Amino acid sequence: MSSHALAKPQGWGGGISPLATSHGKLFMWFFLISDALTFTGLLVALGFFRHKFHDVWPVSTQVFTHFPFTHAHLPLVYVGWMTFDLILSSVTMVLAVEAGHRKDQKGVLLWMALTIVGGAIFVGSQVWEWAIFINGSHEGKMINQVINGVWQLAPFRGANLRYNEYAVTDTGMSVPHYADFFFCVTGFHGFHVFSGVVINIITFTMAYRGVFERRGHYEWIEKVGLYWHFVDLVWVFVFTFFYLL
């Protein structure tokens, strides 16, 4: 029997690596697909409840009008800034991956650091937005609202899980689902961004210590980049379906 016939295929365990990629990147794709299905379920549920309560469902352009250190009426400007920041961090991640392909350690460190900063700014911005959404931004903690069909001044308690100031029916019964979905969807996505920042910090540390130089490749950067781009892409859908529509 020839030596060629005895040769085993190079790859992992049972055969040649499928799709011409490493098992690490393949499993990352599996994870991202399953995670995408979770976000899809949340956004579909949001659409269902929005349709069911369309008569009292708040208009996001009238809800998210705040901006730090000002009292101006700026619909979605702050959320737009958050979106721009996250997209910009995706660009810096692309540059970090490209530097990894060139085995440019300094380039990887620079662009990963900027990606970390961008992600941290987004998380901090979301914390501020949550605080305003929960506690309210009106002076005196009072707000005009409809109670039993009559406009009157009522205590202002913010839009928390037990009370939704923005969705009040003509019977005075509040519909808290807007706040429920706001905390659930943005919180779940925010957790992903926070996790990504932590992973990016770990990656930066590994690059600084020369781990990838010793390995001879920067594939880890590519896998982290896939996750970060996924998080950015999901936010585009969240921004569109929750804030714009």
Go through the PLM ranges and name each one:
Residues 1-245:
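...captures the hydrophobic TM-helix bundle architecture rather than a specific catalytic motif
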